């Protein structure tokens, strides 16, 4: 199951993939190699930017196209599961919420890059998160991803067996993104990101329908996370870090905090402030991309 990137090309770690390569259909994207000229459409891709919301990523693609003065494609996905927009060398693909949805998107994105003949794509996740001891509006560039058991692995159950895989992220890319953040006066911190399995109990919220723990249990857990170097909580980081590492792709996770979980559970900020916070990961990442590509 393990594979490496060789000679800068996207290589397939699945030995059975070649059998169906010529007729491969990316089901959740709604197109395949015999229904779309994938190399013509995606062959110049250098960056794949991904995040949860389809609406947000449509906006991100449109904003980037306007800023860079380049065309923005229509939604290239032919499925209602995900959206795909392309602006020059950048693909914008949403992944939904949680690791199951993300894992589907990543596998089909990796296959898409293979079919397109792309060399050395960089994957960046842009998202929102809950802060752990950092103020709202802080952009956390993750050093590593931690699972709900507080281990630095992504856990998969395959054929009834527990498989653990590393959750490494690219240090050079992280440092470069942080440098751009300083240049743009965007509040940036680095630290670990905890990947919860759900939004409510898994993140020790007190405002869900179920709650079998006490308020002090919540704060004790958050203090423990903070002491371990965790700076934010979301629901995708372990899968994202593990899959991109396993595939041999440079990757980063850039998430803005919408609240400090030490102060509460609900996002209670004005709409204008919320929008400005959501723009911060976009501003940081696109400034880096434009610096790298010259567009």
Curated annotation (Swiss-Prot):
Task: Please give the coiled-coil regions recorded for this protein.
Answer: none
- Which residues hold phosphate? 81, 125-128
Q: What is the lineage of its organism?
A: Eukaryota, Metazoa, Ecdysozoa, Nematoda, Chromadorea
What is the protein name stated in its UniProt record? Uridine and thymidine phosphorylase
Q: Which Pfam families match?
A: PNP_UDP_1 (PF01048)
One cellular-component annotation, GO: cytosol
Task: Fetch the PANTHER family from UniProt.
Answer: FI09636P-RELATED, URIDINE PHOSPHORYLASE
The source's domain of life comes to Eukaryota
Q: Which reaction does it catalyse?
A: uridine + phosphate = alpha-D-ribose 1-phosphate + uracil; thymidine + phosphate = 2-deoxy-alpha-D-ribose 1-phosphate + thymine; 2'-deoxyuridine + phosphate = 2-deoxy-alpha-D-ribose 1-phosphate + uracil
* Keyword set, alphabetical order: Glycosyltransferase, Pyrimidine biosynthesis, Transferase
The positions annotated for binding substrate are: 203, 205
Matching entries from NCBIfam families are given as: euk_UDPppase
Question: Which family does the UniProt entry place this protein in?
Answer: Belongs to the PNP/UDP phosphorylase family.
Pathway per the UniProt entry: Pyrimidine metabolism; UMP biosynthesis via salvage pathway; uracil from uridine (phosphorylase route): step 1/1; Pyrimidine metabolism; dTMP biosynthesis via salvage pathway; dTMP from thymine: step 1/2
The tissues in which it is expressed are: Expressed in hypodermis, pharynx, spermatheca and gonad.
The enzyme's E.C. designation: 2.4.2.2
Q: Which InterPro entries match?
A: Nucleoside_phosphorylase_d (IPR000845), Nucleoside_phosphorylase_sf (IPR035994), Uridine_phosphorylase_euk (IPR010059)
Q: Which purpose does this protein serve, as stated in its record?
A: Catalyzes the reversible phosphorylytic cleavage of uridine and thymidine to uracil and ribose-phosphate or thymine and deoxyribose-1-phosphate. The produced molecules are then utilized as carbon and energy sources or in the rescue of pyrimidine bases for nucleotide synthesis. Required for normal lifespan.
Phenotype upon gene inactivation: RNAi-mediated knockdown causes resistance to 5-fluorouracil (5-FU)-mediated toxicity.
Q: Which organism is it from?
A: Caenorhabditis elegans
| GO BP terms | nucleotide catabolic process; thymidine metabolic process; UMP salvage; uracil catabolic process; uracil metabolic process; uridine catabolic process; uridine metabolic process
The UniProt GO MF terms for this protein read:
deoxyuridine phosphorylase activity; thymidine phosphorylase activity; uridine phosphorylase activity
